[in-house]
UniProtKB/Swiss-Prot annotation:
One of its GO terms (molecular function) is monooxygenase activity. The keyword Flavoprotein applies. The lineage of its organism: Eukaryota, Fungi, Dikarya, Ascomycota, Pezizomycotina. Its EC number is 1.-.-.-. FAD binds at V79, R146, D358, G371. The active site is at R227. Residues 1-29 are annotated as: Disordered. Belongs to the paxM FAD-dependent monooxygenase family. Residues 8-17 have a biased composition (Basic and acidic residues). This is FAD-dependent monooxygenase AacuC.
């Protein structure tokens, strides 16, 4: 019997620091102590990278609180771009593990009937000229297996002597400006405080209530995703799947493919060990009476429902149908792709609570940048706090948090807008037009301004200007978003109005987004 490990809860004691150690040469040098005490809420990748980078920059990580009862190895593959991977160069053991776990894959784009549109190809950042520019930095694989990547971070956190406290659900965030602290109250009534609290506890974080007075309202994107993963040996039992990909698996290769049909698309990853897919239909294609999409990673959907949705358009390749048919019962998640308008403020009024990752800005799969942005956030925040608290003066933390916010907001907003462009391409109703003109246009966009960014270097370049802007009111201009772009705030409602008016998001972009 093959087990489904799409959602696995790990042992909370496995990463006890007493079980892990590093020799001095395997840890990065620490910056001079800032005497800043940092409390982190959330032990996902954003929280763990925040802990690692705060330690490296000389801050004291006093606690890492996590609401789950142990590590949660949710998901299958994630894309972590060069702008995030480059920041891990300071951690020798992480670099070694990234190289050991390295797996390459080629990318294909196909019509839903199996007709090839483009491929083999790759994400733009791994073209030969860009690989040469990153010589000496950690290799950026086309994907990371999330379970392996996350366990790597947990090991490194344990090696520097930090322990995640599981089963700690935060019910309230607070700050005391006079006392110079922020804090949280957990479900059991315990109070924890520090000079700075980092909310890395994803969407619906209770820090929203302190910072904005409410949770950000959600609006449907008009799409949802049926997402599942299963062992490759199970998928290979289907003759059509075996015929199409059996030799690929036998050669030990991995494929990353996008299958595109009118009103829906399917992202597919095939490796020798497991297969993962996500079917994203427009809402009008959803099956009446099916499982309502909710923001939960508990798998509760049977494959027949996914097949019913798939068959809303005819002529799917039998290999795709066979893959879904061989997915174990109740092993599929139906997740709504909800949009939340980006808030400008990610810090509390007194600056003692600050948000990173999905707590500050949610993303959707079409951006292919959620994990990348979370790591960029963590690195940026730790470096800003280093400069703000230089000389062992933790009182500078609120200003450091605000500078972090200033450096990140516009870039994140632009990345979010890119997800609409990718969604348009992947859900195009008339793929014949794409095929006739330029097949390259079907590719998921991963532009230079996104992947060539170095968040740590950017802090050291811009900190003085940002400080002068916030303290003295001087002009400030970010340069970490598309060149030539005249940044303006935008809302989901405005984007939807343009789409309903027949306008393409890509045609409305100014500056060089490519």
């Amino acid at each position: 019997m093959v087990s489904n490990e799409y959602l696995t809860h790990g042992d909370k004691d496995e990463f006890d620091p007493a079980k892990w150690s590093s020799t001095p040469g395997e840890l990065p040098p620490r910056s001079p102590a800032t005497n800043l005490n940092v409390l982190i809420v959330g032990a996902g990748p954003a929280g763990l990278i925040t802990a690692l980078e705060c330690w490296r920059k000389g801050h004291n990580v006093v606690r890492i609180l996590e609401r789950s009862q142990g590590p949660v190895y949710t998901g299958d593959i994630i894309v972590i771009g060069p702008s995030a991977i480059c920041t891990l160069r300071h951690w020798p053991e992480i670099c070694r593990e990234l190289d050991q776990d390295r797996s390459d894959s080629v990318m294909y784009y196909r019509r839903h009937n199996g007709e090839l549109i483009l491929g083999p190809t790759t994400l733009g950042y791994n073209s030969p000229e860009h690989l040469a520019q990153r010589h000496g930095l950690p290799y950026v694989a086309p994907h990371q297996v999330r379970r392996q990547f996350y366990r790597m971070l947990l090991r490194q956190v344990a090696r520097i002597g930090l322990q995640v406290e599981y089963g700690q659900r935060v019910e309230r965030y607070f700050e005391d400006e006079a006392a110079g602290v922020g804090g949280v109250v957990t479900a059991d009534g315990s109070v924890r405080a520090a000079h700075l609290v980092v909310a890395a506890d994803a969407f619906k974080t209770r820090s929203d209530l302190l910072i904005a007075g409410r949770h950000a309202p959600t609006r449907s994107s008009g799409m949802s995703v049926y997402r599942a993963a299963l062992p490759t040996e199970l998928a290979l039992r289907d003759p059509a799947f075996q015929a199409r990909w059996g030799e690929v698996v036998a050669r030990g290769e991995s494929h990353h493919e996008f299958w595109i049909g009118p009103g829906m698309h399917l992202g597919l990853f095939i490796s020798p060990n497991f297969v993962a897919y996500g079917l994203s239909p427009r809402d009008k294609f959803l099956q009446p009476g099916g499982i309502e999409p909710i923001e939960s990673w508990d798998p509760d959907v049977n494959p027949q429902e996914v097949l019913d949705v798939l068959h809303r358009i005819p002529d799917w390749d039998p290999a795709i149908e066979g893959l879904i048919r061989h997915t174990p019962p109740r092993a599929t998640v139906h997740w709504p792709l909800l949009w939340r308008n980006l808030r400008r403020e990610w810090t509390s009024k007194a600056g003692r609570v600050v948000q990173v990752g999905d707590a500050a800005h949610t993303t959707v799969p079409a951006s292919i940048s959620g994990g990348t942005l979370a790591i960029e956030d963590a690195v940026t925040l730790a470096a800003c706090l280093q400069l703000a608290c230089a000389g062992g003066a933790p009182g500078g933390a609120p200003l450091g948090a605000r500078i972090y916010n200033l450096l990140r907001y516009q870039r994140v907003s632009c990345v979010q807008k890119m997800s609409f462009v990718n969604s348009e391409n992947l859900g195009a109703a008339d793929m014949n037009e794409v095929l006739k003109k330029d097949p390259e246009k079907v590719k998921v966009r991963f532009p230079k301004w996104l992947f060539q960014h170095d968040p740590e270097a950017y802090v050291y370049e811009k900190y003085g200007q940002a400080y002068a802007h916030l303290v003295l009111g001087t002009d400030f201009q970010n340069t970490n978003f598309p060149p030539g772009h005249d940044f303006k705030m935008w809302t989901i409602e405005e984007i939807h109005a343009d789409i309903l008016a027949g306008k393409k998001v890509a045609d409305l972009l100014d500056g060089d987004w490519d």
